[in-house]
Amino acid sequence: MLFGRLTERAQRVLAHAQEEAIRLNHSNIGTEHLLLGLMKEPEGIAAKVLESFNITEDKVIEEVEKLIGHGQDHVGTLHYTPRAKKVIELSMDEARKLHHNFVGTEHILLGLIRENEGVAARVFANLDLNITKARAQVVKALGNPEMSNKNAQASKSNNTPTLDSLARDLTVIAKDGTLDPVIGRDKEITRVIEVLSRRTKNNPVLIGEPGVGKTAIAEGLAQAIVNNEVPETLKDKRVMSLDMGTVVAGTKYRGEFEERLKKVMEEIQQAGNVILFIDELHTLVGAGGAEGAIDASNILKPALARGELQCIGATTLDEYRKNIEKDAALERRFQPVQVDEPSVVDTVAILKGLRDRYEAHHRINISDEAIEAAVKLSNRYVSDRFLPDKAIDLIDEASSKVRLKSHTTPNNLKEIEQEIEKVKNEKDAAVHAQEFENAANLRDKQTKLEKQYEEAKNEWKNAQNGMSTSLSEEDIAEVIAGWTGIPLTKINETESEKLLSLEDTLHERVIGQKDAVNSISKAVRRARAGLKDPKRPIGSFIFLGPTGVGKTELARALAESMFGDDDAMIRVDMSEFMEKHAVSRLVGAPPGYVGHDDGGQLTEKVRRKPYSVILFDEIEKAHPDVFNILLQVLDDGHLTDTKGRTVDFRNTIIIMTSNVGAQELQDQRFAGFGGSSDGQDYETIRKTMLKELKNSFRPEFLNRVDDIIVFHKLTKEELKEIVTMMVNKLTNRLSEQNINIIVTDKAKDKIAEEGYDPEYGARPLIRAIQKTIEDNLSELILDGNQIEGKKVTVDHDGKEFKYDIAEQTSETKTPSQA
């Protein structure tokens, strides 16, 4: 906090506040201690105004001790509470509004009056202080607010009226203490000062990625000038931030823009103490340049080269390359100052420096742990933005969320409000119907409810004031989870049980295949427990096996268990990539080709949803060169699209399916389901498929995959389970039409027998169910048989399928029997 502008009496008030906190054994200095400090200075305007309302020091002490009492013995440094910081901030704002260049006791009182949620506000309420009258009394005691340094300010800026109307004076704002402190940028500020001190071409341009703190460096220079921490050459300089949009705005006729800009330049040259700051420097190029007119950059060039105009620019690397570098004459007039992204350690220091401002604004405590979590989590999971901007945004939003959560009106108050509204409407209706006795009773009820509401509201507010709201690591994790969709909050008991039983969940849809299900489940648990390699995807798998054994189904089941919907996965059908050039569809078309602006089918989806299951289906169908693009994804967890953006794959599960080697197995007569020597068959299938996989794909690709899993062939028992699962799905579909279907075990066995095919796996079962049940049922429905609301039993008598239609009883009204 900035205490340099406090008067001696105001400084004594803060010292008294600290003494009162120590006397009362309190661990922090709050608004109540500031109020006690004001009362300890009886000659101050604040104390005199309060005394005029019959508020004395003894009364204030009595109220404070009644409200919060004495604390335990406290040892250690006293810190200001967020509300006390807010009061100091508001007092500075009041001084600025009254055009005072100092902060006195009267401004602190105005700050306490404006901050209406602390203990001091409750003391004022208990002592029946009329806030509006007290404020008017303070302003009256100060005399005419226009009589301070306004005239001096006007005379100072009279030399540059046009510039003052088009630009913000950063030095004045820095003097008011409203600029955020600049931390850890001493090297860059020193370099800017060195360039500004040159004889010619003394124009630094700050170049860096968006959000690294370029504008903050210009603000840091303004603060250094105000604090007298600059060389003699820059003392008493004014840093003016020029907005090119304001300069162009309203210039309707030719020559108007040029005239306005020339006027600004003349004022700067005559004043001799102005440093011009142009944020988004690339807007100079082309600004005001209508047909036949000269743009802003060409008007400024001569003055920039001669050193008549000191200008600081700020722009991003991309904009500098596109707009400034292509104009060599403009580029040589500026000296680049590279602004790099700060490290994690530096960002933590920056956030700790800004903590007071955010605590005062949100009125909560921000812990060191929350700051460190914000920096680490934003650095790890928000890959398309830069520190410190993304970490600051994270702290700001999390603080806002915590503040709103703690100040949401409780349900009991909302219920009383609704009851009051209801009684009020009933009373109005009774008056309208001239039922005055009933209306009088309702009026009494309304008065009673309003009193009850006020008591409950005061009780809630008192509880809120007594409670210190803090920002925790968990709050930060919640916000970043909302930004990215990646679950980062602590694992609760329900989720823990869900993760531990993930195998059972997957087996509800995938019959058999224990090896594959176990590998996938372990990868998900590792990631959720925070043990996975942070530079690689959660897991990458190749599923091998004959067609129809559940490779794609397992990927769908995983997507459903993680996101609640099996369509939530990103599916890439590799049969669409049989040509070499089709790889451009994954990362986007090259510049100059159709579709360059649309982005890649894969990269765009992952950018939008970084936490996802990606399925590359039937990989052996794609051109072999397509897989070269996946090498970096599997190893480093990132991929660069055609626009140069790095897409983060570190929070994805990559599943590739293939039935490579199936043809060779068929030739060797090992394909098929069931068999006498299942273990021996599986080993033969496994060896054959792995051998074919190595022949089909390059070793550097296979070496980057976490696990290659060969799926087992399905047994007849597993086929029967699959039939039951498919019949249950059909039952659920028919229940929507109010048809209850029961399929007997004999019918299921016959379907499994008819759908059994050693070459095609489980897929023939779908066709068998269509042929044996769905076709006949559809004929029954369309043939005029009223089977809606009835029970249909499907059985097999050894020769053919039988369909028995009967009325539903109370026991058969649910489809769960199928």
From Swiss-Prot:
Residues 471-662 are annotated as: II. Keywords: ATP-binding, Chaperone, Nucleotide-binding, Repeat, Stress response, Virulence. SMART domains: AAA, ClpB_D2-small. The keyword Chaperone applies. Residues 417-452 form the UVR domain. Residues 6-71 are annotated as: Repeat 1. The keyword Magnesium does not apply. GO terms for biological process: stress response to cadmium ion; stress response to copper ion. GO terms for molecular function: ATP binding; ATP hydrolysis activity. It comes from the Bacteria. Belongs to the ClpA/ClpB family. ClpC subfamily. May interact with ClpP. This is ATP-dependent Clp protease ATP-binding subunit ClpC. It comes from Staphylococcus aureus (strain NCTC 8325 / PS 47).
